A protein has these predicted regions:
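C-terminal extensions
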Residues: 1-13, 17-86
C-alpha cells in the first residue's frame, strides 16, 4: 500500500485513513480514479471485497468522493457526505 496515495485520498472531505484504505482495497490508486465512476458500483465492490454488508453511509461517502473527483469547483454543501443520502 502506498502511503502517498492514502494521503491523497484523505484530501477528499469525509475520507480518513480507514476509508482511504477501503478505496485502495477495491483497486483505486488516485483521486482521479474516482472521476465519473458509479458510486453504487464502488459500494457493491466494497461489499464484495469485505464479504459483508457495508453500512449505507459508505455509499454516501462514495457519492461525495465521486463528486469531488469529477468537478473542479465544489459546492461546500455537497462536500458533506451526509448531504448525499437517498
Amino acid at each position: 500500500m502506498n502511503k502517498a496515495i492514502i494521503k491523497e485520498f484523505q484530501q477528499i472531505p469525509g475520507v480518513g485513513k480507514i476509508i482511504a484504505n477501503d478505496f485502495w482495497n477495491i483497486g483505486l490508486r488516485s483521486v482521479s480514479d474516482l472521476k465519473d465512476k458509479s458510486p453504487e458500483d464502488l459500494y457493491w465492490k466494497l461489499c464484495q471485497y469485505q464479504h459483508a454488508h457495508v453500512d449505507r453511509c459508505m455509499l454516501y461517502v462514495f457519492r461525495c468522493a465521486v463528486y469531488y473527483a469529477s468537478n473542479e469547483t465544489h459546492d461546500p454543501e455537497l462536500l458533506k457526505w451526509w448531504n448525499w443520502k437517498d
